[in-house]
Structure formats: structure tokens, C-alpha cells
A protein has these predicted regions:
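Non-catalytic cell-wall polysaccharide-engagement segments
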Residues: 158
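Histidine- and acidic-residue-rich, metal-dependent catalytic cores
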Residues: 161
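Feature responds to low-complexity, polar/acidic, surface-exposed segments characteristic
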Residues: 22-46, 54-118, 123-154, 167-176
């Protein structure tokens, strides 16, 4: 993440991989992290919170942004549908339907915590749908101690996510 001269938060890594965000009524207002008591400018995730809130991708919770909260499948559906320009203001019902209709997810267990391999699979399907996956963008996962524990459905997506720096290992493991 970085700030532009006009103090707009940018996320060049995700933009490079095609996850550019359509115009939002909130873009450029810098309402972001400054309005959340649980997000401080010194936090490592501050720029990310600014980006997702300034671009209307996330709104936080009733009591703050909740950066330590576990991400659910529904949360990712909502974010991806908003990146795709959908109006998903009803929390997740419309986003769930969008994810099913676009083969991003099967739409099951919305409140379940999302695993790293589920995250990779959904991002990969979205990137494929947008024509953003290049043939040379896959990594060899054999260097990770738990590579064999990656589910078959997510193997190619995990290779793509690692090759493109979307996911990295933790202590020599993928933790799928």
C-alpha cells in the first residue's frame, strides 16, 4: 500500500493482479481507518483498512473495524462482489448469489471462517473470470512442509496465489 500525493490510499499489488476497484461514492473521502477506534495509524494494516474503506469494499462492524476478527466466506463474497461493481449493501445475501452465479464459490457455510486455500481458490476463480491469470504465474509448492495437505480443488489456485505474492508461507508452511 502507499499514499498518493493527494493522500489517496493505493494498493498496487492487488491492482497489478487485476483487482482494481471501480469508482465508489466513498472514494477519496479518507473516511477510512481514522473513524475506527481499533485501527491506529501505527498499525501494520492501517493502509489496507484505509484502502478497503475508502473504496467502499468494507465498512467495519458496529463497534469498529475489528481487524483481529476472523474473515468469513461471506466477507470475501461481499468484497469480491463490490470489486466487481455490485451493490452488496445487504450484508451478504446478494454477494452470496453473485458468487454462486459467477462460479466463485458454491455459496455454502457463509459464516464459516475462510481458510487460506478457500481464499486462494475464490480469488483465483475471480481472476480467471476477469482474464487475469497468465500461464507462467504458478509456483512449485513442494518447498512447503505441508504442501501435500492442500486440497485437490485448491492446488492450482494455491500455486497461483503463491507465485503472485498473494499468499506467502508461515514458518515454511502454507497452512492451507
Amino acid at each position: 500500500m502507499r499514499w498518493t500525493a493527494s493522500r489517496k490510499c493505493e494498493c498496487p499489488h492487488l491492482i497489478r493482479h487485476g483487482f482494481a476497484v471501480p469508482p465508489s461514492p466513498h472514494r477519496g473521502r479518507q473516511r477510512g481507518a481514522q473513524t475506527f477506534a481499533d485501527v491506529q495509524e501505527s498499525d501494520w494494516f492501517y493502509d489496507a483498512v484505509c484502502y478497503v474503506t475508502d473504496n467502499g469494499l468494507m465498512n467495519g462492524t458496529g463497534s469498529g473495524f475489528a481487524p483481529q476478527q476472523t474473515t468469513s466466506r461471506a466477507m470475501l463474497w461481499a468484497v469480491l462482489s463490490r470489486v466487481d461493481g455490485q451493490n452488496a449493501n445487504d450484508w451478504y445475501a446478494a454477494a452470496q448469489l453473485w458468487a454462486i452465479q459467477h462460479d466463485i464459490s458454491d455459496g455454502t457455510v457463509p459464516e464459516a471462517p475462510i481458510t487460506r486455500e478457500q481464499l486462494a481458490a475464490m480469488l483465483y476463480r475471480y481472476a480467471q473470470r476477469k482474464g487475469l491469470v497468465r500461464a507462467a504465474s504458478y509456483a512449485d509448492l513442494s518447498g512447503f512442509a505441508d504442501a501435500a495437505s492442500v486440497s485437490a480443488y485448491a492446488d492450482e489456485a494455491m500455486q497461483w496465489a503463491v507465485a503472485n505474492g498473494i499468499l506467502t508461507g508461515m514458518g515454511g508452511k502454507l497452512c492451507p
